[in-house]
Amino acid sequence: MKRITYLLLLCAVGLMAQEARSQNPAPVTFTAAQDHQNMMDQLGIKALRPGPSGDANASNHANYDEALANPFPTLPDVLTLKNGKKVTTPAMWWNQRRPEIVEDMDREVYGRVPKNTPTVTWTVKLSDKEFVNRTPVIAKQLIGHVDNSSCPQIDVNIEMTLVLPLNAKGPVPVLMMFGFGRLPSPSQPTPAELAKINDALKALLLNSDPSLKEIFEQHPAYQPFAPATGTGGFAGFGPPTPPREATPDIPGVPGVNNDLPSTEQLLADGWGYATINPSSIQADNGAGLTKGIIGLVNKGQPRKPDDWGSLRAWAWGAARALDYLEANEPTVDAKHVGIEGVSRYGKAALVTLAYEPKFAMALVGSSGEGGAKLNRRNFGEAVESLTGTGEYHWMAGNFLKYGASDATFGSKNPGDLPVDSHELIAMCAPKLTFISYGLPAKGDANWLDQQGSYMATIAAGPVFKLLGLKDLGVSNDYKTEKMPPVNTPMLDGQLAWRQHDQGHQDQANMKWFLKWADANIGHKTSTSSTGTRP
């Protein structure tokens, strides 16, 4: 009887899944160009202006002349309501002005997160005790399965790697980083364990192919799995690489990278870190918009003009990962979790801090257009760079309107945007916000518009001050303030800026971020940065 009941239950589950599939039309399969055209058709756009070229010899090369960089010099006032009334109290900011900005950002720039986003169930794939440099850690690989019962044809499994110091005396702050994570230094078999593995493997091979006996007798010292340095040896077996030290600073010689990897700096300071794979949340291309979390919620159908783009989707996924840390990891100080990213992931980090309330801080690296750079600036990367087929998927469909040269509504340009990036930075207040850039000569290209990002940071300052915090400590006149010299730390407030002397990375600013964040959250290193390998 129990067996019959079990079989009936299995049949019922199968029928329910089949019914869910039959109720949904098949997911649409578009190329990026087809999806882009679909959105143009929805918006009534007939033609878009091409984005500027990074090739200095091209006819439409990007502008790098500061005299031509500000065709729309006046930004929307971050502390003026749409009715013209000045915002003078924190209550007016929270209850009136910020909601206005959020609505415009949602509708026109980054898109709306649906109200019916599904739940995420996390599973620990493996947990491993490892060493990172001299710090003993516990490293975990996790999968967050997104409930796809509404559209079983689409699977979304969020990938996260979590690394925490093993000997912490209490909960530690964590920096979550957008990127492709892996276990830092997987533990290896001891010599005795390796010998046992080799004996078993040889026996298995001989049983499968007795002719191998002659080969093994000719090479008696051969071992299929041999200890090796780093990740050498057959199939990567071998001890981890030995501890590394940062090279000493060289006084008077700028541009020399003396920094350990960011992950090692974090652990040495008593932090943990997590890496979250953005592509496991939402593909980084337009062809993927009917898949991933955006496609799942839309049941495989194309976006509407105010639907979310990949930047909001990545931010949503990061927030679900923070939900897991808060609920399941007592050694994580969930009130002091930050978000980090560089380049497109720098954009995502800024969007995450602005929208997701549980994140306490961000290190926003070289984020450019769609991130900290002012949209109204004509310098390097432009709005039109993000309205073409290559990068439009980051944004709401409505963002395409601001690159339109011919449409049923006429044409629009960046000056028509109701909001700009200084307001995105202001949305982060009162949380700790560190804007980071590098040196164009070292690879952090002028294309990113460091000056335009500095202007946006300056223009966001009044909101931090209204909320009783400190900004960069200079005037809020974004039209006249110029960037300070390279390597000048502007870290006295909760809004921070530093341009380092390296390339397209934020590793060179990590020690500055940690010093600044530690001071603001009252963190003291709680782990030993030295350790002995077993």
Predicted regions and their residues:
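Cap/lid segment of the alpha/beta-hydrolase catalytic domain
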Residues: 177-334, 368-378
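Mobile cap/lid helix-loop segments that gate and shape the active-site cleft of serine hydrolases
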Residues: 252, 293, 304, 320, ...
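Conserved strand-to-loop "acid loop" that flanks and positions the catalytic carboxylate
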Residues: 429-449, 500-502
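Short beta-strand element of the alpha/beta-hydrolase
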Residues: 159-161, 170-180
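C-terminal catalytic histidine-bearing segment of alpha/beta-hydrolase fold enzymes
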Residues: 440, 455-533
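Alpha/beta-hydrolase fold nucleophile elbow
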Residues: 331-343
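Glycine-rich nucleophile elbow surrounding the catalytic serine of serine-hydrolase chemistry
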Residues: 341-353
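N-terminal pre-domain segments of enzymes
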Residues: 19-113, 231-241, 516, 525-534
